[in-house]
Amino acid sequence: MAKKALIAKANRKPKFRVRAYTRCSRCGRPRAVFRKFGLCRICFREMAHRGELPGVTKASW
């Protein structure tokens, strides 16, 4: 329940712009969020492995 409240709080426009922070659009995790995809590193990895993110390939060098 607390996580849902924090997600709702993050969606609201803050009084000051600096207070805004990114959250994963899938699970609500506040840390390690890729801005381009709006996903945290864990969700990004899972979705990339399943092929749900077009254009994302596993790096190999």
UniProtKB/Swiss-Prot annotation:
Cofactor(s) the record lists: Zn(2+)
GO terms under cellular component: cytoplasm; small ribosomal subunit
Molecular function per GO: rRNA binding; structural constituent of ribosome; zinc ion binding
SUPFAM superfamilies in the record: Glucocorticoid receptor-like (DNA-binding domain) (SSF57716)
Residues binding Zn(2+), per UniProt: 24, 27, 40, 43
Domain of life, source organism: Bacteria
Official protein name in the record: Small ribosomal subunit protein uS14
Species in which this protein is naturally found: Thermobifida fusca (strain YX)
Organism classification: Bacteria, Bacillati, Actinomycetota, Actinomycetes, Streptosporangiales
